[in-house]
Amino acid sequence: MNDVQSQPLTLYIACPRGLEGLLADELADFGAEVTGTTVAGVHAQADTAMAYRICLWSRLANRVVLCLLREQGIERPEALVEAARRVDWGAHLRAGSSLAVDFHGQSEHIRHTRFGAQSVKDGIVDAMRAAGRERPAVDLKTPDARIYAHLHRGRLLLGLDLVGGSLHQRGYRRDAGHAPLKENLAAALLMRADWPARARRGEPLVDPLCGAGTLLIEAALMAADIAPQLSRDYFAFEAWVGHDPDAWRELQREAQARANVGRRRVKSKLYGRDQSPPAIAAAKANAMRAGIPALIDLQGAEVAQLTRPEGVDGPGLVITNPPYGERLGELPEVVPIYTALGERLRAEFEGWQLALFTGNPDLGHRTGLRAEKQYAFKNGPLDCKLLLIPVVAQRTERETSSEGDEPQGASGATSRPGPRNDGAQMFANRLEKNRKRLKKWLKQSGERCYRLYDADMPEYALAVDVYGDRVHVQEYAPPRSVDPRQAQRRLLDALEVIPQVLGVRPESVHYKQRTRQAGKAQYAKQDASGERFEVSEGPARLWVNLRDYLDTGLFLDHRPVRRRLREMADGKRFLNLFCYTGTATVQAALGGASDSVSVDLSNTYLAWARDNFALNRLDPSRHRVVRDDCLRWLETAGSEFDLIFMDPPTFSNSKKMDAVLDVQRDHARLIELAMARLAPGGTLVFSNNQRRFVLDAAVGERFAVEDISARTFDPDFSRRPDLHHCFLIRHR
């Protein structure tokens, strides 16, 4: 035994935030002396064998660091170098060893981790040279020794990483699946759900949305008493001067023996279900690599089909990590998962314990089950909670009103409605009422794209647009005076009710939050699905995209305006200014326009317009698109047109424009320039969506103006007569 082995070791054991208390308990159970906890870590004293035991057996730790130096007042790189020089590195690093420095933190003068790592490395090299030892080589990928350095508020910790990588990497999870949990976080959730004690009693465990199986595999490793790092082929402490090979081999033999016995003695059966065949395949492959495939029953099944496994009696644990809609557009698909889960649990798993991990507790409460405990965790950057919920057959009383302390759950993943709170039922009733009101008009017109609901009830500030068998939902951002949690509850109510009333699948509902847009923001992508589909409007075929952009490519309120343009266009030269996706040009061309020019500044929308033209077989030599600032183009254009449509944005400050556009301030100038391009006897159709728009009196004095706004709303927009303004303007 050398001097290092004979001395107590000071250790820092790092872990994810929120796991510190659990890790301290785990270390104490191992027999280590816990000396303190800090954010994302625990300090402990241990001998060499105990340090090895922590590396081999900890289910919660990320790293195990042998502390070599702690100092305060480290702000400058020179002080960092000098601190590193004071460590006797020769007592820990073997001659000829390669190293890498992992630097965490910063100071006023050390702002980049790479610079901090370089400073520590320089100090180590200086110290080794001063001691007459060989300079260590740097190997960032596979070093023999990994140096851990942490600097926070001038406090420096330098140490030797005994693992050489993160302990959450068990080696089995090569097929990660969608949004996987890290293994040590999964283990922490299982511990909070009291799984180790439940496994000793032989209770079953079910994960109805198992994904790649991380929760199941970690649960099986616990139940079978298998060390999480038993299959790891290398630890950095094997290159440490103080390494004790005999102690390490003894620990490995002990762990292997426990695993052999544990696999035979497991009383619990574990069940994983997921609707995704690739996820089930990944879970099976991961379980095979973990060495416990016989302990887990994996089958494909949707949440709405969840049943208690055959032959399973008595209570057990249902633990799962459903998607929680961290991206807004996913919410319509996610909400029914939680309510379907609640319904199936009440029907099949009464008396069981549900451990539900979610980044959106309001979604968690959609199960209709009430949590008796909850624990805060971090899942990467996301704040999450583990809700511990006893499964009872009856829905909680809290669900009778959306105004209580907790939101209620509604119906399941199908369109079959279940119990609703008063607000949700009122919203559903309004949707039904609006459908009946529009039914005759829809049948007569043949329209399949229309607005069904537009903030009719102030509590549900949404616009609901139907596009055939798909639905586009926009939430108007609530004012600051509205409690955000109440707004979230009502939104979840609405997203659950909409597919039920309309008879569509939840994944056919696309949700966005609407805020004031300006400049590039109105063109910015919300997603990158590229998921577009064809709709019809009269004789026109048009592409729409409900997912990727704030707008869909088709302004439904302007439908009557486009219809009027089609009726006016026969034989005319047509100009479309601020053309967006070119839908007005398509209608004019189908109405017989001899040729057209469509002008817009956005490459995105001009490409969309070209696709719409191609879909309707418009001749590109007769129907041209031009990328330009409309104001600048009007000032330089020389052509005349018989019919002009101009629908400028209310406000735009795009960098591509020469100046900021404000339609109220600038419309007179725009109209004047457009009229200069209008042939005698022609018509300018001028429209805008400025709610409080007032036409400049000078326009009416110079030109013949007819306000046709009231005639440009179909029944689906008749409740919003201020949504746009429209004028026919002609030369006197």
Curated annotation (Swiss-Prot):
Top-level taxonomic group: Bacteria
Region spans: Disordered: 396-424
Catalysis: reaction(s): guanosine(2445) in 23S rRNA + S-adenosyl-L-methionine = N(2)-methylguanosine(2445) in 23S rRNA + S-adenosyl-L-homocysteine + H(+); guanosine(2069) in 23S rRNA + S-adenosyl-L-methionine = N(2)-methylguanosine(2069) in 23S rRNA + S-adenosyl-L-homocysteine + H(+)
Compartment(s) where it occurs, according to its Swiss-Prot or TrEMBL record: Cytoplasm
EC number(s) given by UniProt: 2.1.1.173, 2.1.1.264
Gene Ontology terms, MF aspect: 23S rRNA (guanine(2445)-N(2))-methyltransferase activity; RNA binding; rRNA (guanine-N7-)-methyltransferase activity
Keyword annotations of the record: Cytoplasm, Methyltransferase, RNA-binding, rRNA processing, S-adenosyl-L-methionine, Transferase
Record-linked PROSITE patterns: THUMP
Main location: cytoplasm
Leading EC class: transferase
Every THUMP domain range: 50-162
One term under GO cellular component: cytoplasm
SUPFAM superfamilies tied to this protein: S-adenosyl-L-methionine-dependent methyltransferases (SSF53335)
Residues forming coiled coils: none
Family under the similarity heading: Belongs to the methyltransferase superfamily. RlmKL family.
Task of the protein: Specifically methylates the guanine in position 2445 (m2G2445) and the guanine in position 2069 (m7G2069) of 23S rRNA.
Protein name as it appears in the record: Ribosomal RNA large subunit methyltransferase K/L
Gene field: rlmL
